Amino acid sequence: MRAVLLVCLLAGLAHADLFTAIADLQHMLGAEKDVTTIIDQYIEAERARLDDLRRYAHEYVHRNAHAESVGPEFVTNPINAYLLIKRLTTEWKKVENIMLNNKASTFLKNITDNRVRSEVKFPGEEDLSGAATALLRLQDTYSLDTLDLSNGIIGGEKVSNKLSGHDTFEVGRSAYNQKDYYHCLMWMQVALVKIENENPPTIEEWEILEYLAYSLYQQGNVRRALSLTKRLAKIAPNHPRAKGNVKWYEDMLQGKDMVGDLPPIVNKRVEYDGIVERDAYEALCRGEIPPVEPKWKNKLRCYLKRDKPFLKLAPIKVEILRFDPLAVLFKNVIHDSEIEVIKELASPKLKRATVQNSKTGELEHATYRISKSAWLKGDLDPVIDRVNRRIEDFTNLNQATSEELQVANYGLGGHYDPHFDFARKEEKNAFKTLNTGNRIATVLFYMSQPERGGATVFNHLGTAVFPSKNDALFWYNLRRDGEGDLRTRHAACPVLLGVKWVSNKWIHEKGQEFTRPCGLEEEVQENFIGDLSPYANDP
């Protein structure tokens, strides 16, 4: 019966992937307000109300009022976003059970039908899991303390409400379900601390102990796992697995020293993603940037690009970020009004971003890329056409063979792990249908400026570029001889606080033969963008 009612309630409403774009989370704020209305209507219709149900109604009212007072920025905070999703998944199920006891299935069906007609999006279990995983990703990338993060403290600053013991437990359980015992151990420890100060506790101690004990065992802390399991058996004597687990751990420790204090907890982080430069990547995301080599330090500079007739009247500001390979930042090259048009055009088209499988050539979703994107044709709106022409002005590269403008909105902890923009030789059928060659260069427009996080980092080069609204980052993916430049492997760091909107243009080889010809010597690369050296004419 419960399963039938759940299907009735959420059919057509539960939308996975909401966590992959902050824009969707902002739209979801209205759904929480809808929950309050549902509960209030049910109370009036039945003329009776259980105390627990009324408590949930008051909590929803209070939380929604706070969220509305903050506005759309409410869900740009990862803790707030997680709690919002949790309230609309786990806690709503509790509300559903209370209604079920009152035989409210008919009432719920009417509400569900209304929601379907109004197209209100509700999160699903995948969204809750994705939100929890995002918190863990942010914790690792930015070296956040588990207790601080659970208390809404980031970088020593209180930025959100704190998590309850149950909230914290759910984050740990999400890690457990992914066999991530490193994070499960930390979050279950904090859950124990939380419930000590809760009256009544939001979750029972024995529920936490079982997950914590097994995670301790998996991380090599067998004696501690045994100690906690004995405690579990004592406070929950009817637990179906406790006594058996005690014997299992005792057998495992047979013949070993069981006397004395428990050894320190061992909790080594295990990497499952195969990213060998993980430490360097995360350090760059935190702004731990190595010093510039002395030979380049005095050469990095800004200049005015005016090597085209139009640019003589309206020169473009260029900041050289790095030589060999060259990377520059074009300053103020997209206007706020243009950004708003692009976001408005892209929002209805946003779909979860995909990556190309190097073996099959198929596009697929991946946990290492959390965002939603949309593609905008040049003839869709005059603004898109104008931006495309401007790209040609400041890159000097022919746009006839560039891809459509891709717009991306990063979700909760949104990121894109280290990758190449160009296709490597072993990749199957990459860009074959385009018949325009490889991606010679990338233009990345920053259309918003997150409060924290969201940098573009080049791991092997030790370069980190933090988003600056209205600017565009540019780099060449290929050497002048057409070979892929492996040094351009880069990543989009997780967004810690705020919203990240970007748009990018991938420019292809075909049509650039005379604009960027192969040099006489392989090692000779560009020192600036444009046909002529800008320095001689700079004021």
Swiss-Prot record:
Signal sequence segment: 1-16
Glycosylated residues are 110
Provide the residue positions that the database annotates as binding 2-oxoglutarate: 500
Which keywords appear in this protein's UniProt record, sorted alphabetically? Answer: Dioxygenase, Endoplasmic reticulum, Glycoprotein, Iron, Metal-binding, Oxidoreductase, Signal, Vitamin C
Asked whether the UniProt record includes Glycoprotein among its keywords, one would answer yes
A GO biological process of this protein is: macromolecule modification
Q: Which reaction equation describes what this protein catalyses?
A: L-prolyl-[collagen] + 2-oxoglutarate + O2 = trans-4-hydroxy-L-prolyl-[collagen] + succinate + CO2
Q: How is the cofactor bound?
A: Binds 1 Fe(2+) ion per subunit.
Name the protein family. Answer: Belongs to the P4HA family.
Q: What is this protein called?
A: Prolyl 4-hydroxylase subunit alpha-2
Source taxonomy lineage?
Eukaryota, Metazoa, Ecdysozoa, Nematoda, Chromadorea
